[in-house]
Amino acid sequence: MTTTIQLASSRQWIGLCLFVALTPPLLAQALSATNPLDRVESSQVDDAVRTVMQRNNVPAVSLAIVRHAQIAYLKAYGAAELSTDIGHIHPTRSSRAASVSTRFAIGSISKEFTAAAILVLADRGQLSLDDTVSKYLPQLTGASRITIRELLNHTSGYLDYFLQEYIPARMQRPTSVDAILKAWAQRPLAFLPGEDWQYSGTNYVIAGRIVEKITGEPYEKFLEDNVLRPIGITDETFADHPSQPERNAVGYYRFALGPPRLAPLTGRNWLFAMADLEMTARDVALWDVSVINQSLLCSACYQAMSSEAKTSNGGPTGYGLGFFVRQIAGTDGKQHLMLHHPGEISGFRSHNFVLPDLKAAVVILTNAEYSDTTSELAEQLQSVVGIKPAEQSGADTAVSFIPSAVEENAIEARAHRLMLHLAQGLVDRADLAPDASETFTREAINDIRKSLAPLGDLERVKLDSTQLRGGTKHYALTLIYHRRKLQIAEYDLADGKIEQFLIDDKP
């Protein structure tokens, strides 16, 4: 019997369609009994993780590799929690080891699960992806013109409420979902629905609220009962309602190249439905296996999830429903679909890659918000899952703009001036918006100054790329020293004030 689901409009039906510590308490832990990687492959994976962790000063990595639609490799490295002397990254006997049962905050990988929750409801005929938001939340801007599909693929036009790559002091205090929607989803749109693409967490807060409106249940309960439990995930927790916190990794960040510092916690409800899950690498891998096997949803649902959305004029977005989508070259000489999503939240970075037709996946979870360990590891591990090593993992689709030569020179000159002053322990607060100014504490300034001192003189600042997001202009800049390069992620508000000025190592 063929089943049908209403994924489109009421008139259109679609057929069913991964630095091992030297001390014994912190030896890397693995489930070797279920590890079919051969000795050479396992050694290559271990060497890659160990090298990248040591180079980037990352406390812990948890890694899962899926091959043949089965978890083929599951291993954790390093310290889930550092000793109280956090000025020293090398784990000591008082550090808590990471294990394969350690949970990490997965950040925006959570969006994959929110998209799945919506698709469960679509599969059951309880909503259509082309229902307008007004059916559930009529008070929101553009609600009668924006569809649920446009929420999930980021073509709605709603501004991103959580665009900073740090947690402002105001977001360390509790909020409510309704307050987020009132403040951010009742503003003018960034563009007309469907006409452009901008990544926005606001879309997924709205989607999570729609789940609650339809089901009459808290979003978390519906997700557990209808997405997680059916595919064997029983060990997750949520940032707002943590269980067994002693099993969770502690997150760390740093200022420039300074020592790891305890990352602040995000206030209650700020992560709702868009970045709130905390999971083991195994749990994320179980989700990936379900995507590969299409075991939770109907085939039309997976087709919708994995199909790249287009703007109204046919432009690319690089995004499906809850996943970035791209084609990537395999070691077999063919092109293969890759679904992936990065996650970054206070103290954590992660990345999930799924290759459905290769029946493979890679999950990389870390408790360091600094450095790009996940991307570095992904590039080194691609051959293990049948992808050409030279192939890059792919950057997020971004709406870019081209500054004039005068603007480009001004951006580079200001960043150069700010860096010169920071190297002297000074901050030009007149250039900073309140959120950014609050991040430059005395501890932060000292860490930056001390870590920059060994680099010598700053020779040049170079603007690499630009992006528009959440009503801000994003600038990626390279800092060129004699023997090293750093990078800046700068976000500017409409008034020209700097909302973010983060300094990190450059891969």
Place the predicted regions along the sequence by residue.
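Short, well-ordered beta-strand elements
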Residues: H351-N367, L486-A489, I498-D504
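Short, conserved catalytic-motif segment at the N-terminal edge
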Residues: P36-F104, Q126-D131, Q186
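Short, surface-exposed loop or secondary-structure junction motifs
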Residues: A79-E81, I86, S144-S346
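Short, gly/Ser/Thr-rich active-site loops of penicillin-recognizing serine hydrolases
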Residues: N367-E443
